[in-house]
């Protein structure tokens, strides 16, 4: 959203050698109108590409929305826009382990509405379950992590101190409880 759009920061991220991708939520923004979502997607992609190179995209889970942002690809093809990858379609999770801090925790799949992959059950059986960053670093130090891992992180959730940290903790805790209710209601 607008709070995460800062031209100078976006350019600086690329200047540091990082890839900049588009974290889209157009089905949600356009109330499920797939054609409007496509137009909105292209508009924002073009706007971002005026600043930096963009070759990858990833949907925003939008847990409170009744619309799944990935559904835009049921009709349209992101590759036609020069996009080379969308993780939920282009990563083989049989070969790549997935860790996300969704819900401000590394085992956020328990409360995630849309940020899920089918292989999660297999990883749980293999003992690849991590609650804290310390759990992950311990597994790394003990050579217990797979060779290929995709991380999805939300840096604002890991603030260093005081009020911002507590505010994020409180907000994410409330959000996780709401998502649990949504998951139970949708079963």
Where do the protein language model's features map onto the residues?
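Terminal accessory/targeting
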Residues: 4, 15, 27, 34-187
């Amino acid at each position: 959203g607008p709070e995460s759009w800062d031209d100078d920061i976006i350019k600086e991220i690329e200047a540091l050698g990082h890839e900049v991708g588009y974290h889209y939520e157009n089905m949600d923004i356009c109330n499920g109108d797939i054609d409007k979502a496509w137009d909105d997607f292209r508009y924002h992609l073009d706007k971002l590409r005026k600043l930096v190179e963009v070759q990858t995209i990833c949907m925003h889970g939008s847990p409170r929305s009744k619309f799944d942002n990935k559904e835009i690809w049921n009709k349209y093809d992101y590759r036609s826009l020069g996009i080379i990858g969308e993780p939920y379609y282009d990563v083989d999770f049989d070969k790549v382990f997935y860790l996300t801090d969704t819900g401000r925790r590394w085992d956020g799949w328990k409360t995630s509405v849309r940020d899920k992959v089918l292989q999660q059950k297999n990883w749980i059986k293999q003992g690849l379950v991590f609650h804290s960053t310390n759990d992950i670093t311990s597994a790394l130090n003990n050579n217990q992590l797979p060779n290929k891992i995709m991380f999805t992180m939300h840096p604002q959730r890991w603030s260093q101190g005081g009020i911002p940290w507590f505010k994020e903790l409180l907000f994410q805790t409330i959000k996780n409880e709401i998502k649990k209710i949504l998951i139970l209601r949708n079963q």
